[in-house]
């Protein structure tokens, strides 16, 4: 964390005082000429110029008011399209000076060809590194020193990610600025600056409220539901930043069970076996939900650090605890499967997902052609109401899900984001569970299936290195057997 040091104390996360954002339309809308002109003038004043290399440590910091003006102006932009416009102008007009980069690169190359002494070459490389720093990084750096500045930058990145998702702003300059800001936030929110805190029913009401509102995986229905999730045989932990203790950034829910759970309803709906924990009943820790409270921290490795810290905490409390696993949703599986059904439905007579006997069994229950009937049933989750249809679908859905998790890739890594997260952590893709989430959300997003990613603590390091370096997925016999069934029965 070089470059932070004692000055980190100045990076407080207190709420900034800028005008609240009234709701406005989210569709793309160009700024008026007056607003565009105001944006350009603001950026010229707020973004500090890059000092000459020789003066980089002697140039005074810009006046605090210039950064505060940017914060105030940005906070007053009511519409997502306006904020996107300002961020696009910042990324496009205040990045790297490519002329300087080319000049410094040529200098480094020339010195290498001349075989100059190491000190001269190292200084030339340092000049090149300096030229590669975009101007807006200086703005972000100075904003971070304001009261509430880091919190503002977290929200700014959340806005940037939303604008990219809505295609309000696009292009390589915007992607680069997002990466720079993510890197800066990763330093400010590294594990050394994070506090692990446990939530109980006696925690402050505002903490319980925030955690219940930010629960993204299995929504909290009411206060009794929340009480159950922080009560006996349950643990809830969160990370807070050292400058704002008690303010959750990322939250992890854990169930303490007799074995590795295969059904989420048994965790979030059923009452614990007793009000007093009996340690001999606890043999497994199941991570069943992890949620960010700040969308601007996406991609910052808070979840990975949180799981590691919680494992250590649980080992202190329960030295005999031997099994650590997630019980994870499979977002995107139904959407992926519906996409395949759509493609094959357009090509009459083509069937590469189900065997002939499976098609016959499914058609006998639905009374319609397999592809057309399944598209509606899978989208609505209605198929689960028929015991015969559920039985007919169990085999094909299990093997299709195994292939989706194990075989479908993005740049060589698991396509499914939850799978990719746990595999990066070094977990093993351990078990796919049938009808593990019978909620409407579970049925429509992942056909009711859930998966355990098991953490064998002595193997997580090598597994993570193998996955990140060689893109190898460590999987159990059940997963590999289902993948083999897919490969022999399907022709994708």
Swiss-Prot record:
Acetylation at Lys-471 activates malonyl-CoA decarboxylase activity. Deacetylation at Lys-471 by SIRT4 represses activity, leading to promote lipogenesis. Interchain disulfide bonds may form in peroxisomes (Potential). Interchain disulfide bonds are not expected to form in the reducing environment of the cytoplasm and mitochondria. It holds the Pfam family MCD. The keyword Disulfide bond applies. Gene3D superfamilies: Malonyl-CoA decarboxylase, catalytic domain, Malonyl-CoA decarboxylase, oligemerization domain. It catalyses: malonyl-CoA + H(+) = acetyl-CoA + CO2. Pathway: Metabolic intermediate biosynthesis; acetyl-CoA biosynthesis; acetyl-CoA from malonyl-CoA: step 1/1. Malonyl-CoA binds at residues 298-304, 328, 422. GO terms for molecular function: identical protein binding; malonyl-CoA decarboxylase activity. GO terms for cellular component: cytoplasm; mitochondrial matrix; mitochondrion; peroxisomal matrix; peroxisome. Residues 1-38 form a transit peptide. The modification N6-succinyllysine is found at residues 167, 221, 385. Expressed in liver, heart, skeletal muscles and adipose tissues (at protein level). Ubiquitous. Strongly expressed in liver, kidney, heart, skeletal muscle and adipose tissues. Weakly expressed in brain. Residues 39-189 are annotated as: Alpha-helical domain. A motif (Microbody targeting signal) lies at residues 490-492. It is found in: Cytoplasm; Mitochondrion matrix; Peroxisome; Peroxisome matrix. Malonyl-CoA decarboxylase activity does not require any cofactors or divalent metal ions. It is an enzyme of class 4 (lyase). It comes from the Eukaryota. Keywords: Acetylation, Cytoplasm, Decarboxylase, Disulfide bond, Fatty acid biosynthesis, Fatty acid metabolism, Lipid biosynthesis, Lipid metabolism, Lyase, Mitochondrion, Peroxisome, Transit peptide. Catalyzes the conversion of malonyl-CoA to acetyl-CoA. In the fatty acid biosynthesis MCD selectively removes malonyl-CoA and thus assures that methyl-malonyl-CoA is the only chain elongating substrate for fatty acid synthase and that fatty acids with multiple methyl side chains are produced. In peroxisomes it may be involved in degrading intraperoxisomal malonyl-CoA, which is generated by the peroxisomal beta-oxidation of odd chain-length dicarboxylic fatty acids. Homotetramer. Dimer of dimers. The two subunits within a dimer display conformational differences suggesting that at any given moment, only one of the two subunits is competent for malonyl-CoA binding and catalytic activity. Under oxidizing conditions, can form disulfide-linked homotetramers (in vitro). Associates with the peroxisomal targeting signal receptor PEX5. This is Malonyl-CoA decarboxylase, mitochondrial. It comes from Rattus norvegicus (Rat). The gene is Mlycd.
